[in-house]
């Protein structure tokens, strides 16, 4: 399991579910929930993350800006994995610093596995 988890969630209902699940798992001491990905800038510069999961609304491409911000601020370690849940028909233009490793199609969903490069 993970030593520490940082959730970024704006939706109040989803945050309540996260909190309830953390309580159920007795994992509150291993997790924090923040509202905005830009709040990561308040973390220690030494803190690095190795797994990112993006599940934006299908029509929303703003997550690409989030990936750029993570790269610009070096919030990732060398072994990072980025997982993105998209509509299978979506066409996204990723930054050159994001390398797609592989994609999987499940029904109308596309799951993209990638990595941020230094």
Residue ranges and their predicted role:
Residues 1-118:
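Class I S-adenosyl-L-methionine-dependent methyltransferase catalytic core
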């Amino acid at each position: 399991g993970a030593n520490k988890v940082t959730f970024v969630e704006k939706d109040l209902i989803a945050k309540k579910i996260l909190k309830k699940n953390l309580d159920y798992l007795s994992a509150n001491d291993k997790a924090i929930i923040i509202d905005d990905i830009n709040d990561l800038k308040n973390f220690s510069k030494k803190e690095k993350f190795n797994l990112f999961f993006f599940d934006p609304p299908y029509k929303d491409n703003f997550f690409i800006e989030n990936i750029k911000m993570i790269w610009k601020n070096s919030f990732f370690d060398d072994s990072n994995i980025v997982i993105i849940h998209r509509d299978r028909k979506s066409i996204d233009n990723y930054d050159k610093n994001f390398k797609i490793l592989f994609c999987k199609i499940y029904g109308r969903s596309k799951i993209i596995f990638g990595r941020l490069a230094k």
